[in-house]
């Protein structure tokens, strides 16, 4: 890649360069950063943490809608919702395509992203990762009941993803890296840090093989969050 994965270097600022608003640690912000990295797009990250005690800045352009991160701005176009942003990044910029050409394959990628957002993200990140790996930072014990309740939910979501993962790989949809890989990787980077999450992934051979390869990609290494340390 000839352009930086994270922010613009001095002298690279351009009115055409996109701006990404959000906290670097956020799963959905990372999915967008991964898409930008894989496309080789230079961008500027403006740190916005809507979960901070003081909340988002009053002048945050998107705070009057759903107070969401990430948000994205490019050539006057303003977007929010990570899956909309990653699709825009794929179509608006040069670089390797992150969506298949065929309608069935494209539908499969969209299906995987939908499963991640609707069934996997909340139990894996908020119930498993936050409780097991971050509760102590807040000075409290992990909520074991919450963790136990999340495990069957995660198992069901990962079972569906295991069935949809291409048997020959190396990526979820086959030989080509797609947005499905990026959205799932952003979530598993946290979820797999909890022993319960790691065990659930390891028990599914296709996903486990995929994750071991995906986590080594330069884009993953260059977008690591301090929370992964």
Predicted regions and their residues:
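GST-like fold's C-terminal all-alpha helical module
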Residues: 118-213
